[in-house]
């Protein structure tokens, strides 16, 4: 920057020597200086690399340059001699700072903002910022200062354009120009002449006037294209012009001497004469001691010529000099992605953004006046946070077990924090620092939202917008709950208390009312019911109720007695909660205020007095003040929750805060980890969480049916469970990994499960046909029956000290006991109504009774001393005592997992065995495991299973793969051990590892669920090339995609094709597929690139739905679902036989595994197999498997054989498709949209042939006439013109050669087929009303002797006798017509001969080819007709001898074959190809024009798109808005979004910057509120929907595209 400094100093010196100044201007991307006398030279860049610099000014005396950047929404500065050092001056609260001016005397910075419509001032460093003007401003732009007189001037180009003047202290505001003005842009002052100059870009003039607006005169008029900024130096005016991209100048008096100073400016913006003369020195009234002001000292036009002022929101004290210490009353506002504060002390109501990070979806907000913390909830971060009022000291308060915290309230007296959670449906409390958390209310809550507290009385109030909306009240400890209002409510969103008058106010977003009542529910009345379309946030302070409105995008307030309303903030989107508060005033007290009421943890005040409470995991001891961690306690599970009860006190049970529990059944714990485990038979999961409810996770999610029994192996850290539905006992690690089936044979409804890890035994009960209690080693071995004669035993538990078993018998209603061998049975209790769960601790047994709805206790040996521990409990499923004595002992698995790689399973006599996950095998070291290499995979609708044929292993397990919705087909890559499947719901191909990890979308629709682009049907993997071949039901093609998701392209496509099932044989280079063409299904074979296509079978098929092949046996298998049979053949199609056709109902999948062919029958829900050798016949493999969809065999991969495949290494060197030829070498090929290049390895773009041409895939010939395509003769060197030829349509006749002709030409006496097959076997009988021509042709009898030849042999006009003399005129007419026809025919024939045979053909290099052709064409050439080769002479290399040439400008008026489909290029010039290969005919001389880019409908850019700083926008500087149009409406301008409409509806919504249109069908069902309203200023690129579709669940907004809906929805827990 040294050169810049030297230039600046030199130029500044020049200014002193001559009258021409340096001009400082903004160029959007940089700031520059240019010499006004030599503007043709390059300008000097002062600051570069800017985003969108608009306004610029300077303080010459301090060497500072300031500019505004509208893209970064900031004002910045730099020093002359340090221009590489850029400082931020103002970075918040700006949207479009269009104007900027420096007060060089008072050292202040003034600016205009055309988005916020404010004029502000601050110190030169950006501190002590103050809003001067905020009313009656509409698009303020240029601003100029006159510090010596204390005046400021600005332009306003809004609805009422004008130029105003005011004191620099905000006083004496006056409009000085308001006529003949439209777009006043530039503004400058002549300090010597006391004149005001301005430029109008619409009216194209520069005018001047006195500083008070009088004596207005034109300086330049009519010759200004688009003046923008204006400055003055001595006698010359300078301005920037947007149209000419230049700086111009003229005489300031006369306007003469108009000239261009500097041109070729990228985007000229603001401009100033950079000179000390433009900032003359004068007396500074603020120069001494800042004028005595504590904060701001601003110039004023009235004595004493200055005025003290305070920063925004702060009042000036009565002495007129000193500002108060901040605002005394604030309005705190939560927006979606930021928090703001608004001072209620001053009338400007300026919102100031707090400098906080990572706010994603703030909802509720509250304030603690004692410590000065703001508290807020974030629905997306799922946390409660706090910070000081200036944004500093940000902390996370609560982060665990938070779902959707919609309401928050501070108890400033007891120092507690309350919140509602509409995800967990709970109201909870904690200390203000987030410790000592406790659930207060968790029952009968649907959608709790707003919550307020009255610490002085001891009540809390909350709203619930569930199915039955209501407002409730309870004591601060959750007791004494009562409903205050439950009628005439819709969406009660907001709630506020008036402590002085004892009333409670609320706002309803559905009824659109603000109502009030007494705190006891009496005296209900309406305060406001007009123009409040959607209330959300709600608060009260003093005499005013404040609220936010989503739809109006506003904050308003109403006087609580007079009902007078006032808008505080308008057009601010994403409004959520708000809180009006006194900053320091603290009201009220209660006994909890002093020493926390004597409580060790929580002090909760009630109307009856304080109550000490304990957080989760603690219990209150006898003094009722102190909380301790109990040594032991009872845990029990009910349907929807898990609770605990103290064994030492009489306190009520306490719910453990767990979310999402549906139907908890079995329960256990791990005392060392302080976790609980439970099964959920509704969710079909096994879950765990810490005792405080945190870190909840599902450890087993797949393959469960009714997991009624479960137990924790606390030594081996394993989890055991019994599944009554699947009849299995399984084990895994505590985190669900390494799952293995231990017992599956001869199990009949296993139920309760108990473990004795120290001894190595497990015990379980069975409820089947012969109920019993069994025992086995913990690895599943040594199974034996202990108690055979028993009813349905449940609650099996072990007394580890006395070595006895206990259980309840549901059939006899007894509690019994035996020793560990099942002997010495004793009845402990016999007069029980309905005992169910059971546990033991010390000298007692504890059980649940469903009839008594109780938990009871009795002596474990005698059954005496029975006591009811807890009553009024419905359907307690399981019970246990949480204590370390229940998990004692030791075995070798407790130490380093027994050094096992996976599972360590205890066995009797202190031993252990290492276990492996299901289907894994234990290695010779007896420690480690190996994954299976050979197995079967089969899929169901929402699961994929693995099966092994091993008597020692459980046959099948469900793989833990998430998000399976509708699995249609599966395949497996044995190299990477990745599973691939088609999801027909998402219309995608996905892959994942067997353990569910590394999930990935391989092929997916770009637009989900609408206008489906793809619809995969079947897939097959080429493991050598690493490709997936898949058929698409939507586009009817065979597509190829790399395993990493990169597309290769379509390899097979035909007009009539319907490829469905597919299997590849990469060892031979072929693929086989079913082609379900209408009325003619086929099984076909083609090379892997789609060439060499042949039909193997077209008869004896109805719906061939599945394919399989065995490459080693050389066999192809298929299943026909309509014919209900399975067939096979050789891979060539020979030796077709029916393998099985009996008792097959709906075969949908086939696979070959060893010597067996496996298939799945969807209707019979069965997997079967048949021995292909015929020795063992047909066998059922597994039955009762619902919703089967596919099956696939995985064989062990021989790496040596794999590496020998020529395509396995780098895809054989091919860029796309690698095929194996018969000799074992490779051939590279390409998908249909590409062609093979000359290196015969790489694919590239095809040559550009005309629409009337066909592009050969490879070879030296690029283009041939499309009429030669599929004509039975090969012209392309690679024969590609005769590949994939379409089947003739019903209206056509297929010649023996495959050529298609019009069916009407069959047997017409002329050979239209090149092989003349259309005239063979033509013995046809004509109808009664037809005449038979001599050649066999049939024509209507009325055409006989009608003077018109109808038979091709003219036989219809032979032997005719005229009946009357023809009129001469008619004869002349007929003759004329015939003459015309003959003339046309002769001309056409000559033209055809010229074009086809005689005209020279151009090579690719432009040389003339001299081959001549003679065509003997028929009298008429039907569309698509190609002459027989015998009628042609001449030949070309690579074409059939005697082939005719058809010009690209065909005389037949159109293409004679299918359109060019390999390159999909239309409208391109054939001469544009870079290929040097030959073309069969000359290129079109004048190629068609290229497609034009559609122009924007708007030629004028829109401005800064949002009123919200948080909204991301990409725009350039906005010149003008369309101010004569109304601003965009809100997404729903009436209550249409709030009112009733169907939850399921079709909606079309189009939004532009000028408004919205929507098409919505409504009915009477309530729905959530509309999305958060957008700003008035919308980007032209943005599209917004109006009312969103109604969610079907409470969490429909979980993606946070919109604020949380207050619609009545289903419970989300």
Curated annotation (Swiss-Prot):
Region (Beta-propeller 2): 328-589
Region Disordered, residue ranges: 1556-1613
Residue window of motif PPPSP motif D: 1588-1593
Motif PPPSP motif B: positions: 1527-1534
Disulphide bond pairs: 286-297, 293-308, 310-323, 592-603, 599-612, 614-627, 893-904, 900-914, 916-929, 1207-1218, 1214-1228, 1230-1243, 1249-1263, 1256-1276, 1270-1285, 1288-1300, 1295-1313, 1307-1322, 1326-1338, 1333-1351, 1345-1360
Transmembrane residue ranges: 1371-1393
Residue positions of motif PPPSP motif A: 1487-1493
Protein's membrane topology: Single-pass type I membrane protein
Renumbered residue ranges of the record's region Beta-propeller 1: 20-275
Motif PPPSP motif E, residue numbers: 1603-1610
Post-translational modification: Dual phosphorylation of cytoplasmic PPPSP motifs sequentially by GSK3 and CK1 is required for AXIN1-binding, and subsequent stabilization and activation of beta-catenin via preventing GSK3-mediated phosphorylation of beta-catenin. Phosphorylated, in vitro, by GRK5/6 within and outside the PPPSP motifs. Phosphorylation at Ser-1490 by CDK14 during G2/M phase leads to regulation of the Wnt signaling pathway during the cell cycle. Phosphorylation by GSK3B is induced by RPSO1 binding and inhibited by DKK1. Phosphorylated, in vitro, by casein kinase I on Thr-1479. Undergoes gamma-secretase-dependent regulated intramembrane proteolysis (RIP). The extracellular domain is first released by shedding, and then, through the action of gamma-secretase, the intracellular domain (ICD) is released into the cytoplasm where it is free to bind to GSK3B and to activate canonical Wnt signaling.
Residue stretches making up the EGF-like domain: 282-324, 588-628, 889-930, 1203-1244
Domain (LDL-receptor class A): residue spans on this chain: 1248-1286, 1287-1323, 1325-1361
Tissue distribution: Expressed in early embryo. Broadly expressed throughout the embryonic ectoderm and in nascent mesoderm, and in endoderm emerging from the primitive streak.
Cytoplasmic-side segments: 1394-1613
Pfam families: FXa_inhibition, Ldl_recept_a, Ldl_recept_b
Residues modified as Phosphoserine: 1420, 1430, 1490
Positions of modified residues (Phosphothreonine): 1479, 1493
Comp. bias (Pro residues): 1602-1613
Glycyl lysine isopeptide (Lys-Gly) (interchain with G-Cter in ubiquitin) crosslink, residue number(s): 1403
Family according to the record: Belongs to the LDLR family.
Protein task: Component of the Wnt-Fzd-LRP5-LRP6 complex that triggers beta-catenin signaling through inducing aggregation of receptor-ligand complexes into ribosome-sized signalosomes. Cell-surface coreceptor of Wnt/beta-catenin signaling, which plays a pivotal role in bone formation. The Wnt-induced Fzd/LRP6 coreceptor complex recruits DVL1 polymers to the plasma membrane which, in turn, recruits the AXIN1/GSK3B-complex to the cell surface promoting the formation of signalosomes and inhibiting AXIN1/GSK3-mediated phosphorylation and destruction of beta-catenin.
Protein name: Low-density lipoprotein receptor-related protein 6
Source organism: Mus musculus
Gene that this polypeptide is encoded by: Lrp6
């Amino acid at each position: 920057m040294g050169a810049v400094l030297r230039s600046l100093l030199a130029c500044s010196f020049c200014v002193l020597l001559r009258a021409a100044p340096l001009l400082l201007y903004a160029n959007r991307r940089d700031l520059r200086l240019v010499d006004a006398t030599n503007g043709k030279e390059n300008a000097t860049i002062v600051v570069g690399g800017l985003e969108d610099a608009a306004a610029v000014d300077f303080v010459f005396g301090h060497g500072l340059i300031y500019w505004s950047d509208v893209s970064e929404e900031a004002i910045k500065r730099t020093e002359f001699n340090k221009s590489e050092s850029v400082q931020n001056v103002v970075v918040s609260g700006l949207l479009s700072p269009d104007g900027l001016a420096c007060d060089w005397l008072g050292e202040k910075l003034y600016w205009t903002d055309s988005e916020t419509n404010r004029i502000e001032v601050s110190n030169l460093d950006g501190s002590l910022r103050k809003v001067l003007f905020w009313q009656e401003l509409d698009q303020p732009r240029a601003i100029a200062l006159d510090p010596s007189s204390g005046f400021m001037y600005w332009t306003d180009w809004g609805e009422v354009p004008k130029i105003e003047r005011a004191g620099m202290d905000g006083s004496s505001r006056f409009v000085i120009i308001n006529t003949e003005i439209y777009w006043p842009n530039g503004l400058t002052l002549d300090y010597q002449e006391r004149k005001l100059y301005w430029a109008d870009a619409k009216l194209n003039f520069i005018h001047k006037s006195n500083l008070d607006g009088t004596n207005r005169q034109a300086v330049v008029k009519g010759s200004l294209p688009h003046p923008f900024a204006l400055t003055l130096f001595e006698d010359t005016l300078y301005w920037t012009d947007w149209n000419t991209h230049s700086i111009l100048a003229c005489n300031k008096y006369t306007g003469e001497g108009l000239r261009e100073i500097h041109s070729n400016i990228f985007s000229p913006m603001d401009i100033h004469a950079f000179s000390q003369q433009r900032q003359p020195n004068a007396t500074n009234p603020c120069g001494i001691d800042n004028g005595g002001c504590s904060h701001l000292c601003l110039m004023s036009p009235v004595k004493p010529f200055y005025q003290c002022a305070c920063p925004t929101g702060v009042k000036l004290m009565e002495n007129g000099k000193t500002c108060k210490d901040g605002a005394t009353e604030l309005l705190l506002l939560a927006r979606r992605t930021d928090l703001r504060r608004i001072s209620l002390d001053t009338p400007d109501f300026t919102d100031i953004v707090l400098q906080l990070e990572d706010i994603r979806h703030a909802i509720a907000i509250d304030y603690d006046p004692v410590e000065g913390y703001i508290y807020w909830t974030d629905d997306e971060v799922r946390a409660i946070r706090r910070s000081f009022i200036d944004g500093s000291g940000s902390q996370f308060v609560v982060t665990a077990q938070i779902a959707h915290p919609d309401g928050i309230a501070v108890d400033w007296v007891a120092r507690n924090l309350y919140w509602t959670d509409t995800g967990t449906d709970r109201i909870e409390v904690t200390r203000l620092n987030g410790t000592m958390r406790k659930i207060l209310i968790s029952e009968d809550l649907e959608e709790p939202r707003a919550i307020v507290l009255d610490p002085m009385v001891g009540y809390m109030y909350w709203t619930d917008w569930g199915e039955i909306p209501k407002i409730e009240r309870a004591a601060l400890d959750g007791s004494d709950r009562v409903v205050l209002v439950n009628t005439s409510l819709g969406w009660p969103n907001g709630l506020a208390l008036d402590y002085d008058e004892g009333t409670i106010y609320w706002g309803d977003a559905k009824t659109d009312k603000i109502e009030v009542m007494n705190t006891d529910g009496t005296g209900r009345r309406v305060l406001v019911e007009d123009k409040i379309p959607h209330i959300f946030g709600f608060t009260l302070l003093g005499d005013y109720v404040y609220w936010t409105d989503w739809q109006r995008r506003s904050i308003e307030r109403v006087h609580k007695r007079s009902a007078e309303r006032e808008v505080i903030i308008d057009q601010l989107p994403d409004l959520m909660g708000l809180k009006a508060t006194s900053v320091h005033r603290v009201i009220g007290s209660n006994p909890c205020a002093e020493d926390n009421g004597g409580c060790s943890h929580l002090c909760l005040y009630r109307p009856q007095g304080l109550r000490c409470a304990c957080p989760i995991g603690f219990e209150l001891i006898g003094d009722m003040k102190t909380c301790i961690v109990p040594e032991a306690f009872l845990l029990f599970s009910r349907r929807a929750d898990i609770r605990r009860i103290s064994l030492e006190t009489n306190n009520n049970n306490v719910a453990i805060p767990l979310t999402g529990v549906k139907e908890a059944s079995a329960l256990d714990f791990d005392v060392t980890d302080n976790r609980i485990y439970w099964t959920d038979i509704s969710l079909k999961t096994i879950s765990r969480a810490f005792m405080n409810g945190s870190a909840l996770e599902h450890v087993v999610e797949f393959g469960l049916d009714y997991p009624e029994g479960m137990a924790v192996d606390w030594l081996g850290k394993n989890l055991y469970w019994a599944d009554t539905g699947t009849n299995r006992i399984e084990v895994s690690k505590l985190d669900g990994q390494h799952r293995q089936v231990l017992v599956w044979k001869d199990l009949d409804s296993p139920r309760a499960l108990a473990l004795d890890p120290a001894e190595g035994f497990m015990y379980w009960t069975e409820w089947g046909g012969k109920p019993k209690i069994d025992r086995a080693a913990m690895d599943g071995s040594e199974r034996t029956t202990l108690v055979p004669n028993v009813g349905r035993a449940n609650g099996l538990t072990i007394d580890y000290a006395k070595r006895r078993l206990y259980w309840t018998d549901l059939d006899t209603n007894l509690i019994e006991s035996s020793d560990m061998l099942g002997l010495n049975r004793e009845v402990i209790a016999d007069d029980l109504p309905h005992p169910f769960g059971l546990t033991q601790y010390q000298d007692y047994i504890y059980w649940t009774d469903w009839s008594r709805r109780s938990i009871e206790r009795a002596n474990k040996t005698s059954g005496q001393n029975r006591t009811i521990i807890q009553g009024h409990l419905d359907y307690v499923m399981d019970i246990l005592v949480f204590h370390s004595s229940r998990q004692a002992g030791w075995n070798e698995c407790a130490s380093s997992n027994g050094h096992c790689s996976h599972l360590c399973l205890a066995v009797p006599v202190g031993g252990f065995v290492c276990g492996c996950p299901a289907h894994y095998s234990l290695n010779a070291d007896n420690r480690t495991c190996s994954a299976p290499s050979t197995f079967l995979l089969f899929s169901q609708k929402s699961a994929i299973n693995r099966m092994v044929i091993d008597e020692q292993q459980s046959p099948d397990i469900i793989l833990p793969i998430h998000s399976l919705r509708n699995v249609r087909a599966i395949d497996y890559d044995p190299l990477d051990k990745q599973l691939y499947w088609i999801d027909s719901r998402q219309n995608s191909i996905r892959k994942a590892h067997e353990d569910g990890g590394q999930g990935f979308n391989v092929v997916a629709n770009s637009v989900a669920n609408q206008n489906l682009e793809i619809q995969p049907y079947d897939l097959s993997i080429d493991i050598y090339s690493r490709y997936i071949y898949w058929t698409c039901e939507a586009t009817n093609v065979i597509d190829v995609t790399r395993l990493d998701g990169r597309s290769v392209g379509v390899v097979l496509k035909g007009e009539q094709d319907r490829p469905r099932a597919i299997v590849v044989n990469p060892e031979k280079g072929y693929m086989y597929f079913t082609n379900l063409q209408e009325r003619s299904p086929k099984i076909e074979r083609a090379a892997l690139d789609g060439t060499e296509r042949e039909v193997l079978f077209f008869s004896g098929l109805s719906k061939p739905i599945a394919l399989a092949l065995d490459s080693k046996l050389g066999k192809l298998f298929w299943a026909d679902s309509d014919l209900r049979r399975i067939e096979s053949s050789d891979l060539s199609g020979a030796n077709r036989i029916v393998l099985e056709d009996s008792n097959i109902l709906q075969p949908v999948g086939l696979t070959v595994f060893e010597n067996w062919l496996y298939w799945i029958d969807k209707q019979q829900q069965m997997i079967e197999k048949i021995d292909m050798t015929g020795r063992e016949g047909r066998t059922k493999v597994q039955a009762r498997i619902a919703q089967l969809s596919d099956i696939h065999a995985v064989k062990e991969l021989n790496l040596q054989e794999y590496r020998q495949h020529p395509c396995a290494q780098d895809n054989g060197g091919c860029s796309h498709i690698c095929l194996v030829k018969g000799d074992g070498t490779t051939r590279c090929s390409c998908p249909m949209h590409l062609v093979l290049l000359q290196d015969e390895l790489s694919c590239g773009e095809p040559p550009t042939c005309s629409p009337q041409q066909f592009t050969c895939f490879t070879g030296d010939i690029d283009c041939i006439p499309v009429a030669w395509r599929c004509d039975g003769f090969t012209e392309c060197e690679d024969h590609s013109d005769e590949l994939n030829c379409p089947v003739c349509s019903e209206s056509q006749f297929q010649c023996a050669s495959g050529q298609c002709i019009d069916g009407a030409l069959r047997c017409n006496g002329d050979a239209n087929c090149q092989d003349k097959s259309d005239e063979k076997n033509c013995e046809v009988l004509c109808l009664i009303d037809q005449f038979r021509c001599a050649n066999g042709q049939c024509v209507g009898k009325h055409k006989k002797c009608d003077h018109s030849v109808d038979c091709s042999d003219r036989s219809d006009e032979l032997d005719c006798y005229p009946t009357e003399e023809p009129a001469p005129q008619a004869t002349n007419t007929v003759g004329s017509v015939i003459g015309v026809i003959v003339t046309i025919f002769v001309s056409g024939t000559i033209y055809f001969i010229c074009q086809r045979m005689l005209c020279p053909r151009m090579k690719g290099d432009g040389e003339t080819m001299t081959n001549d052709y003679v065509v003997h064409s028929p009298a008429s050439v039907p569309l698509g007709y190609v002459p027989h080769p015998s009628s042609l002479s001449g030949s070309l290399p690579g074409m059939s001898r005697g082939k005719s040439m058809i010009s690209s400008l065909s005389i037949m008026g159109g293409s004679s074959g299918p359109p060019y489909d390999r390159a999909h290029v239309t409208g391109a010039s054939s001469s544009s190809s870079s290929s040097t290969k030959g073309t069969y005919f000359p290129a079109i001389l004048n190629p068609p024009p290229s497609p034009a880019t559609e122009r924007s409908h708007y030629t004028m850019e829109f401005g800064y798109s949002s009123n919200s700083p948080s909204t991301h926008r990409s725009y350039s500087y906005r010149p003008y808005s369309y101010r004569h149009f109304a601003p965009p409406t809100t997404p729903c301008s009436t209550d249409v979004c709030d009112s009733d409409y169907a939850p399921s509806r079709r909606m079309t919504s189009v939004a532009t910057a000028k408004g919205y249109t929507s098409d919505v069908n409504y009915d009477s069902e309530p729905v959530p509120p509309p999305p958060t309203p957008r700003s008035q200023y919308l980007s032209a690129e943005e599209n917004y929907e109006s009312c969103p579709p109604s969610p079907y669940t409470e969490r429909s907004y979980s993606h946070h595209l919109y604020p949380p809906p207050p619609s009545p929805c289903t419970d989300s827990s």
